[in-house]
Structure formats: C-alpha cells, structure tokens
From Swiss-Prot:
Gene assigned in the entry: matK
Protein location: Plastid, Chloroplast
Organism: Anomochloa marantoidea (Herbaceous bamboo)
Source taxonomy: Eukaryota, Viridiplantae, Streptophyta, Embryophyta, Tracheophyta
TM ranges: none
Chain's role: Usually encoded in the trnK tRNA gene intron. Probably assists in splicing its own and other chloroplast group II introns.
Keyword Plastid listed: yes
Pfam families: Intron_maturas2, MatK_N
Record-given protein name: Maturase K
Length: 510
C-alpha cells in the first residue's frame, strides 16, 4: 500500500487548474460546436441532423449561469434547479447539449496539458502510425503466437456516477467544475425519472457523446492505471508469495491474523505468478489479457480483477464478463475480425549429401477472417439486404441523383474492403460486394422505374468502376483489361493500412 500511495503521489498533477471560469466565455461553445462538425465522429449510414448553433442562445445561457448559483443548488436542492428547464423543448435541449459539450471541452484541458508536458513529447511524432487500428494486428502476429491462454474481458460499466466524480476529483482540483458535473448527472436522472444507471449512461452516450466519452475514458484510464501498477508489482510476487497477493485484495485486513495462524506461510515462494510474457490490449469497451502461463495463473488473475472492481469501484462484475480460453483451440472477436491462432502444415525438404528427407512440421499463424454472419446482419439493419443476405433496394435514397447513389454505394464498398484488407480469406468480401452492387442497381432501377437488367446494360463498365477497390486498381494497372472486373482470389495476401483511426460504420453498426 505504501508503494501504491507513492506511485499515486507521483502521478498527480503538480498544478491546480481552474477551468470553471472558461464556461462563461462564448468562444468555448463555438469551438465545441466547430469541433463536433470537423471532428472524427463517424457519419451514420442513414444520415443525421447536426445541432444548430446560435450565439444569441449561448449568450442567454451565460446570463442565466451568472444569475443562478447552480453549482451549490445542484448538490443541496437538485430538484429546484431551473437552469436548463424551459417551456420550449428546443431551448432546453440546446442548453443541455451546448453546455455539456462546452464542459467536456474545458475539462479536457488539464489532461491535454499533461500529455503535452510529458518529457517524451519529442518522440510522439515518430509513433503517429500507431494511431491506426490496423497497427494492433502486426503486434498480435508477433506476440500471440508464443502465448498459451487468453482472457476476453468486458470492461464493466456503469459504475455509480458519484464514483466517476470522485475519480475526476483526484485529477482536477476545481470544485466548481465537479459540482457542474454533478448537476448534469442529476439533471438527466431527474428529467427522465431514471433510477437505473445503465439507462442514464445510454442517454448520455446518445445525446452527449463528448461528455460520455470523457467520463468513460476517465473511468477506463483509472482502471488501467491501477492494473499496470499491479502488473509491475506482480514481478515481485515470487519474493512475497501468494499470501501477500491475497492480502492486497482485502487491503491487509487479515494480515495479522494470517501471521499468527500461519507463521511460515509468508516465507513460501509460488512461481505461478512469475509471468513476464503477459500482454494487454483494449478496444471498444473490451480488453484482451494473453499470457504464456498456466490455467491456474489466469484463474487467479480473473479472481483478482473481480475483487479489484468490487472493492475499488463498488461494482460486482459478473463471471461471464471474463472468459478464459486456450489460445490454440479458440477464436476471438477483435475489432470486427474473427481471429484465431492456427497451425498450418509445412513440408521442408532437407538435403544431406546423397540422401534427401521430407520433414513435416507445423507453424503457428494468426488467422484473421471476416465474420460473414455479423457483417450481413449489419447490412440487413442498414436495409441493404434481407436477413439471409438477399439484396434489396434502398427507397430512402431514391430522391438522390444517380451520381450520389453510385458514390454512396461505391464508397461503402471501398471502405469495407479497405478495413478488411487484412483478412486472409476474401470470399466473404466478394459476397458483400455483390450485395452492395445489386442493391445499388435495384435502387437505381426503382428510381427510374426500370428493370435491373436494363439499367445494368445501359451503364455498363461505369457501374462496375464505382465498386473497384484500391487493391484491384493497382492490379488493373499491372494486368490491363478492356473491361474492369473484380480479381477474385488474385490477392489473398493480407494488407494492414496505417490510416484507419476508427472502426468502420458497418462493423460497429447497431
């Protein structure tokens, strides 16, 4: 515990930031609005309407903030707060959205300053390619082939919202900002009469995405902060024994009793915790913990993580959230890919003087394939096909021009091929291309009240070129053809791109 306190003291901010006065500046809300329009937020397949920005309404909001001391009222009298309440539903929604977006922008400033002030800032540009999602897969190819067991963890949430505020209190010493955060949480819970935290989290995630991402990332950052500290300390467990490991879970409440009952227990050495080859990867609210150790070691880590969430976050994690599997005989869903470690046979010819030998061996390989069922299910939800994969027209797009329809379908197809370029089997991708191509043809035919055959004959090669992917364009320069056509099976090699910074819409579509 002493080591943990020292470690926490080193990680605290050395300066006290007062970000609350920035909420009374109009440019903060304009910046938040512009950031929402120009940010990397994915555009939904069915489209969405951006919230309009009004400087007049922002000025009215700032005046109301000056007139009401809502920071104190939100704690003492949460039901008597009228800052965001308005007879007009639009005004109430606008005040709520723009204030939460501005608050998220302001409260991120201390965390941004912390990153910029790190001594390794000169080395950051060298690793910009690591922002790509695909950069994780070469890491898995290099490391997972030598590991034995894997734990698939669903990071538990929501925890109690007051705990989230307390977590931020350790990082931000601005009391007024923390009161404002409590005000937001009380406002949403009272406005919708919600008692279950899961519904409140869903509401924040839907209507105030930036604020939700900030709260969720703060919570996950705190989890990883302690996990990495304990992971570093686990290398010392060979000297301190499993008994001390158990006592850390229960915060040393039984240490003296243990010492009296079993005086020689703490001098034992248990080698099972010595595991230098443990790797951790987090994505989409999930995490993968892979190890070269024994099943007993993975079970102990599972128990430890469950106790960690229970005692530190007061949250009971269901056992199903941590699934343990042997890496050799199982597959796992990772960033839209269905990944597994396979053993491929390899015949090696060994020539020794006059004799030749054929040696059969097996090599491990990380196999990444496209999950056909889930991807077709996403296309079905987006109304490109039926549940069985039969292409259908998209009536909502018939009001667009022919070029816009072709461009939308072609862009979706190219993005899917681009994201799944690392797949070792491309048959599923060609099936997806067929679905999108025929869905596009039926949409255009429905718009012009014609048949698919007639429309395809009229467009000809122009229609096919829209669904020509980047890889096929490179191959078309090498193998010239009069009519562009997809090269089935001609490029089975996996390609990992370094410009993919978010998961494809259809991969993460719900």
């Amino acid at each position: 515990m002493v080591k943990l306190e020292v470690y926490l003291e080193k990680q605290k901010f050395r300066q006290q930031y007062f970000v609350y006065p920035l909420l009374f500046q109009e440019y903060i809300y304009a910046f938040a609005h512009d950031h929402g329009l120009n940010g990397s937020e994915p555009v939904e397949i069915l489209g969405r309407n951006n919230n309009k920005f009004s400087s007049v309404l922002v000025k009215r909001l700032i005046i109301r903030m000056y007139q009401q001391n809502f920071g104190i009222n939100s704690v003492n009298h949460p039901n008597q707060n009228r800052l965001l309440d308005h007879n007009n539903y639009f005004y109430s929604q606008f005040y709520s959205h723009i204030l939460s977006e501005g608050f998220a922008i302001v409260v991120e400033i201390p965390f941004s300053l912390r990153v910029l002030s790190c001594p390794e800032e000169k080395e950051i540009p060298k690793f910009q390619n690591l922002r790509s999602i695909h950069s994780l897969f070469p890491f898995l190819e290099d490391q997972f082939l030598h590991l034995h067991y894997i734990s698939h963890i669903e990071i538990p949430y929501p925890i109690h919202l007051e705990i989230v505020v307390q977590l931020l209190q350790c990082r931000i010493q601005d009391v007024a900002s923390l009161h404002l955060l409590r005000f937001f949480l009380n406002y949403y819970s009272n406005w919708n009469s919600l008692i279950i935290s899961m519904k409140l989290i869903f509401l924040l995630k839907k209507e105030n995405k930036r604020l939700f991402r900030f709260l969720y990332n703060s919570y996950v950052s705190e989890c990883e902060f302690f996990f990495f500290f304990l992971r570093k300390q686990s290398s010392c467990l060979r000297l301190t024994s499993y008994g001390t490991f158990l006592e850390r879970i229960h915060f040393y409440r039984k240490k003296e009793h243990f010492w009296v009952m079993y005086p020689g227990f703490f001098r034992k050495t248990l080698w099972v915790f010595m595991d230098p080859l443990m790797h951790y990867v987090r994505y989409q609210g999930k995490a993968i913990l892979a190890s070269k150790g024994t099943p007993l070691l993975m079970k102990k880590w599972k128990c430890y993580l469950a106790n960690f969430w229970q005692y530190y976050f007061h949250f009971w994690i269901q056992p199903r959230r941590i699934q343990q599997k042997p890496l050799a005989n199982s597959c796992f869903d990772f960033l839209g890919y269905l990944s597994s470690v396979t053993r491929n046979p390899l015949v090696v010819r060994n020539q020794m003087l006059e004799n030749a030998f054929l040696i059969d061996t097996r090599i491990k390989k990380l196999d990444t394939i496209v999950p056909a069922i889930s991807l077709i299910g996403s296309l079905s939800k987006a109304q490109f096909c039926t549940g069985s994969g039969h292409p259908i027209s998209k009536p909502i797009w018939t009001d667009l021009s022919d070029w816009d329809i072709l461009d939308r379908f072609g862009r979706i197809c190219r993005n899917i091929f681009h994201y799944y370029s690392g797949s070792s089997k491309k048959q599923t991708l060609y099936r997806i291309k067929y679905i999108l191509r025929l869905s596009c043809a039926r949409t255009l035919a429905r718009k012009h009240k014609s048949t698919v055959r007639t429309f395809m004959q009229r467009l000809g090669s122009v229609f096919l070129e829209e669904f020509f992917t980047e890889e096929e364009q490179v191959l078309s320069l090498i193998f010239t053809k009069t009519i562009p056509f997809s090269f089935h099976g001609s490029h089975s090699k996996r390609i990992w791109y370094l410009d993919i910074i978010r998961i494809n819409d259809l991969v993460n579509y719900s």
